[in-house]
Amino acid sequence: MEGVISAPAPPRIPSPDADDLTIRDARPEDAAAVDRLDARITELAKPDYWREIFARFSGRPDSHILIAEVGGRLRGFIIGEVRAWEFGSPPSGWIFAIGVHPDHRLNKLGSRLFEAMCQRLRESGVKTVRTMLARDDNLNMAFFRSQGMMGGPFTQLEMPLD
């Protein structure tokens, strides 16, 4: 076809078997691996940020960092918590970070992490899960929409302070 640019599809890693995939609570020693995966995705290493997140979430019953391992290697993470009464919102779950190794994006690893986080949030008693994305974050927008998320009743506003 004239005018069509095509590129070979990226290699696809087979979907992990249930026996090969483990979703578990993060441990403090996972912070460095999460930072490495996040840096691979975002091209920005943030080790101090991840140490702070891991320290802040440690021991809090309504805050969760979940890790996805395939064959014993960290291949994804998701972070969420219950937040209550911000701007009149009843308690709800918030997902504020998710990362999946690029080689594992087409095999439902992100969906399994999302489902596991939603289950944790349900167990905390909330009935809604929310997130916030940059308008141009098409990858995560497509992912969260594929999970059934859609625009909610709140609008985020901001202004520069300089």
Question: Model-found features: residue ranges?
Answer:
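Conserved beta-strand-loop-alpha-helix junction that forms the acyl-donor binding cleft
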Residues: 131-140, 158, 162
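Conserved active-site alpha-helix within GNAT-family acetyltransferase domains
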Residues: 111, 135-153
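A short, internal acetyl-CoA/4′-phosphopantetheine-binding micro-motif in the GNAT/acyltransferase core
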Residues: 97-105
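Conserved N-terminal entry element of GNAT/NAT acetyltransferase domains
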Residues: 1-29, 162
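Conserved acetyl-CoA-binding loop-helix of GNAT-fold acetyltransferases
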Residues: 106-119, 146
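Active-site/acyl-donor-binding loops of N-acyltransferases
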Residues: 2-6, 147-162
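Conserved GNAT acetyl-CoA-binding A-motif
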Residues: 121-132
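Acetyl-CoA-dependent GNAT
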Residues: 16, 25-28, 36, 40-90, ...
